[in-house]
């Protein structure tokens, strides 16, 4: 199936026409009231899997007639990122060019960041010599409640926007 199947005259679609296990998810998003997306950040960007998902989600919204981006409906969006970087020292590019597509089609997203991730239970079992397990644990223990509160607060704002049409 061509990646242009969603653009066939008279059969255009706002959902990717390629049928697989992602199809029902994309169909549900088209009817959703809000969307939360999350990705670890590797090499300053979202994962390849997230990028592929976002392309499958957003490409059908793109019109090659006028280059507009039109989703089935607008909705609150939250973009979450986890990374090894710190607030003052990270190379995250957020959701890159796909964030523009999300903002244009769905609405301006809110961001939630979780920094300096404590990645594994026992650092001694992995080739992670540049990290201090103790420093990672201390950072997590110090910031965990704050990270949970940020996630709660953004979820609350999303629910208010959905319920009250803000």
Task: Indicate where each model-derived feature is located.
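Short aromatic-enriched loop/helix-cap "lid" or pocket-rim segments at secondary-structure transitions
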Residues: 3, 91-92, 121-126
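Short, solvent-exposed beta-strand-terminating loops
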Residues: 109-125
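Short, glycine-/small-residue-rich phosphate/pyrophosphate-handling segment
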Residues: 48-49, 62-113
